[in-house]
């Protein structure tokens, strides 16, 4: 096949994919309107995942800028080697990469300790499980993951609840929800059949919501605008 033929083939594939995506989005929006549903965005975050922490930093601003129903789910890492080969090495690279990205974005990262207080991990998850059905859960989750990735041992300790819930069951249930929707990774946002991973994809979701007329009159704040 000549170079010209390859280029034409690539262009055709791009156009077909764009048209298919547009058609799927139109169908999803029609179904949403017919059902009278809100614009539902599901956020899947993992306590041990620094990418989840960086994404979580912007989620309140996303909810403030767009008329959406933002649902939070705390998940656990998928240790299947088919999805995450060499998980220890991946975790090390994630910490290093997120430290650099956090510095660029001006997000505090392990500024109160050299490492997350992993000794409190299980107790913290159990404490969050005890309020999973409370309207306070989103704020508590975001505050907890912030304390954890700032290395704030004292802050995490204050969040531990003696009357904690069943964190394992909560994680397993949320992981099943994530899998049923067709994904396995954390730091992901799901909206109308599509996935947006990490901070760098957040603007794509924001643009899609804006195109659907879901933006609030005041528009995106400075924090969201800063990641473009």
Residue ranges and their predicted role:
Residues 23-33:
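A short, compositionally biased domain-edge/stem linker segment
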Residues 41-48:
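Asp-based phosphoryl-transfer active-site loop
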Residues 7-22, 51-62, 139-228:
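C-terminal cap of thioredoxin/glutaredoxin-like
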Residues 34-41:
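A short, charged/proline- and glycine-enriched loop
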Residues 32, 67, 71, 175-178:
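N-proximal short alpha-helices
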């Amino acid at each position: 096949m000549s170079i010209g033929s390859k280029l034409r083939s690539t262009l055709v594939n791009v156009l077909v994919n764009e048209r298919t995506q547009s058609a799927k989005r139109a169908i999803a929006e029609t179904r949403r309107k017919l059902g009278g549903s809100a614009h539902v965005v599901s956020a899947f975050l993992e306590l041990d995942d620094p990418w989840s922490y960086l994404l979580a930093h912007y989620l309140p601003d996303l909810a403030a800028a767009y008329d959406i129903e933002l649902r939070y789910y705390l998940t656990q890492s998928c240790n299947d080697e088919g999805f995450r080969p060499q998980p220890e090495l991946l975790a090390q690279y994630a910490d290093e990469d997120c430290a650099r990205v956090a510095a660029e974005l001006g997000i505090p990262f392990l500024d109160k300790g050299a490492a997350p207080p992993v000794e409190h991990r299980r107790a913290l998850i159990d404490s969050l499980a005890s309020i999973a059905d409370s309207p306070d859960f989103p704020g508590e989750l975001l505050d907890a993951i912030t304390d954890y990735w700032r290395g704030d041992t004292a802050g995490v300790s204050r969040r531990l609840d003696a009357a904690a819930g069943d964190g394992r069951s909560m994680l397993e249930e949320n992981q099943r929800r994530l899998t049923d929707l067709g994904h396995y990774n954390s730091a992901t946002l799901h909206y109308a059949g599509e996935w947006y991973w990490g901070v760098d994809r957040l603007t794509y979701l924001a643009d899609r919501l804006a195109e659907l007329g879901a933006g609030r009159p005041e528009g995106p704040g400075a924090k969201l605008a800063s990641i473009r």
